[in-house]
Amino acid sequence: MNKIRKGDEIIVITGRDKGKRGTISLRVDDSYVLVDGINLVKKHTKPNPLKGTTGGIVEKSMPIHQSNVAIFNAASGKADRVGIKLLADGKKTRVFKSSGEEIKAA
């Protein structure tokens, strides 16, 4: 079970974007996540008339390693850790470590 999933609100805990918040839009591989508006880089693109793209400098979000982000706990307003709790019916659920509150599915 992945502790961080698509749709989770996260906060960046290290790097040049430290403190910024966003929502995970895609999980890349097993250890990278793509967050809208975080880790922006400038890509220089060549014009391609076949694809209908113009050349220039484009800002693009790049993947960030999941160890550099933490799930955001809206109740406390801080970053939090994720724990796995086994329910009585045998299902697993994600909970915040600080409060034990269940994380709502996105």
Swiss-Prot record:
**UniProt keyword annotations, A-Z:** Ribonucleoprotein, Ribosomal protein, RNA-binding, rRNA-binding
Q: What is this protein called?
A: Large ribosomal subunit protein uL24
Subunit description: Part of the 50S ribosomal subunit.
Report which gene this protein is encoded by.
rplX
One GO term (biological process): translation
Signal peptide stretch: none
Q: Which GO terms describe its cellular component?
A: ribonucleoprotein complex; ribosome
- What CDD domains does the annotation carry? KOW_RPL26 (cd06089)
Mind listing the GO molecular function terms for this protein? rRNA binding; structural constituent of ribosome
Q: Per the UniProt entry, what species is this protein from, by scientific name?
A: Polaromonas naphthalenivorans (strain CJ2)
Q: Which InterPro entries match?
A: Rib_uL2_dom2, Ribosomal_uL24, Ribosomal_uL24_CS, Ribosomal_uL24_KOW, Translation_prot_SH3-like_sf
Biological role: One of two assembly initiator proteins, it binds directly to the 5'-end of the 23S rRNA, where it nucleates assembly of the 50S subunit. One of the proteins that surrounds the polypeptide exit tunnel on the outside of the subunit.
Q: Which Pfam families match?
A: ribosomal_L24
Family affiliation: Belongs to the universal ribosomal protein uL24 family.
